[in-house]
Amino acid sequence: RPITIAAISTDILAKTLERCGVKVEVLGFTTKTWKGGRARDYWIKNNKPGSPGRLNELLHIIYKHADHPIRRSKQNFGIMLKEGLLKENIDGEALEWAFKRIISRQEKRKILMVISDGAPVDDSTLSSNDGNMLDLHLKSVIKIIEKKSNVELAAIGIGHDVSRYYTKAVTILDVDELAEVMTKKLIEMF
């Protein structure tokens, strides 16, 4: 249910912003598999050396490219709802990817809004490394974006307090509030 509301809310907000002449890109992330993939298999084949780092394959998805009109991306939003698509979350690397994409843009003002339903989690990575590795990495990426760039970063946590990560953060307990809170957060930034 949260991903359905997120897809609908994002679609509506993207259409509205596009009508106002604002370029919008919609990105998503997950892992390709549960509990590791080829990276984990490779690590096991090599006798499980210590501190292996990430042990899962990333899946970064461009639902709507900033230079494409929303009508060309309409069916991509349906992909968000695909059964079995969403698995584990390696938030730090996903945020780095989104940040690299947005800083390469020509627009003067850049706002990156994160919608999160939990902390970074990847069972294979966390069970084979320091248990807070993904948390620490996310915090370091956020710090770079917030302190050393002109990108304005905001986050909305769905049933999860994201203020322990992001400076500009709000938590909602009811996913039905998402569209309203996304809109309010953007208005605050303008």
Each predicted region: which residue ranges?
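Acidic, glycine-rich A-domain
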Residues: R1-F190
